[in-house]
């Protein structure tokens, strides 16, 4: 914690001053003070962006998106149907707010389930490079406050991720699960759909979660089991 505080003083998250601001394809947009953006940025109608924000090169922000203050949006990012609150970092290559993967089998064809929800990313959170977050179908997909996602994570439609969570790279969530607060998930774990995972849960890397998990539990393995049981059976 001390190292984090010290390095933040010497290496602050600053807004780069050498961005080309001659972007042509910006529609009617509500910008506040000190918004800087790179080359080939496209911003749709009725987008709202708070003060002290940075938008990287080749990024697309589609109509009606809301971005709070002190946010950093990386390069090659696509954002649609999303509300981003304050002090949020979206790293390079993320796609946020696209339609989820939901279909009705109907005779010889699959009919896509409607997705009329949005994505909400709350204050002080970070979404790692190359991650994808699908918008909700009939409800919203939500990322809690002070939650950090590593690179190449997939969050499917309708998931609710709590506050103060840390999720390592290549974790995948199926749809409509709820994650409590202070949850830690190791890399390449998979979370099945329609589950309830409690507060203060630890999920080991590579685990497959197919059942609900109660508060203050540590699990590992496939299917994920109580950590003590897993270690006892895998010595």
Language model: regions and residue ranges:
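Long, leucine- and charge-enriched amphipathic alpha-helices
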Residues: 225, 229-235
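Structural signal for interior beta-strand "rungs" in well-ordered beta-sheet cores
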Residues: 25-26, 30-226
